[in-house]
Amino acid sequence: MTINIKAFERQFQKEYNFLYENDNNVAGYREAVAAFDEFLKENKNFVCEFVQYRGDFISSDREAAAFMFALSNWEV
């Protein structure tokens, strides 16, 4: 998987802000959270790279959903 980490982080932040502004009441939110758990199992290296770049763990459901919504902008 080749994704520009800087561009991904910008998209992640946009998705996170959207979720925050809408109090997580967004179609596909629960599915995205569940999908993150599965994605993590197969793509630990990418998630770790993102966490290191960002300097913060993905520790909330909102962050997990934002990650998956951001990822949906790239073909993987």
Model region roles, listed by residue range:
Residues 20-76:
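Acidic, low-complexity, intrinsically disordered interaction modules
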Residues 3-25:
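N-terminal acidic leader/helix
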Residues 1-6, 72-76:
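Short intrinsically disordered terminal tails
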